[in-house]
Amino acid sequence: MSTAQSQRFAYLGPVGTFTEAALKKITCDSDIKTPYANVTAALDAVRDGEADFALVPIENSVEGVVARTLDELAIGDPLTISGEVTLPVTFAFMVKRGTQNVQRIGTHPHAESQCRDYIAQKYPHAEIVPYPSTAAAAEALSKGDLDAAIASSAAAEHYDLEIREADIGDNSGAVTRFICAQKPGWIPEPTGHDRTSMAVFIDIDHAGALLEILQVFAKYDVNLTFIQSRPTGRELGHYHFIIDVEGHIKDTPVEKSVAELREICDDIRFLGSYPREVRA
């Protein structure tokens, strides 16, 4: 993704998000990194030419998918995925220095869900205030809008907050996967360890339509790694599927399976072929 020439990256901000931490794994010091308030704004920065790439979260090992990211890729103005990065996520409980009474705690809904046990044990009567990101909650805390926040230790450091307790998540080993999106056109060359993503639209009145899709992948021995249904937003009961498979669109099995799917599906939106991040 990054080259010797400086690239412009949009990401889910503000400063101190897990997305920013993930971005640091794939960028150079010379790259321009601009935070945006939400996933849509970050992706729109690429669509509008304000950025070359956008890094946004797509799924978490505990809470599952980030619906907004899936919907933007499937039914928003076209973008393709050129890479992915994963990041272990740990949460800290933070306050402004000297705080004693905690009644309002800010965080992202996914973070709240991953810290339910801690909140129930330590602050069962506190109001949980949702924010677009954990770092946005930390920023609000620094401005006096909250009594506490659940965010990353990096956010606490950036906003000069006191970490009351670290590593408060209910599940150790939680990981978030992020995707790097760009305008359609360029596709990374095959590496032998690739992932291909697509949005598949089917005729809901056709019995066995989803089974037919799965049979096509089985026919060409293509392994599915992810499948998620999402509403199309047109009518109640109308859904499309986001599908990830192992392999590159230039690999013969993937190429043939996608070509055959185009014959039996209402529509397919190619979302990219890109290197998988292989974790030890």
Language-model features, listed with the residues they occupy:
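Domain-level signature for soluble enzymes in the chorismate/prephenate branch of the shikimate pathway
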Residues: 1-280
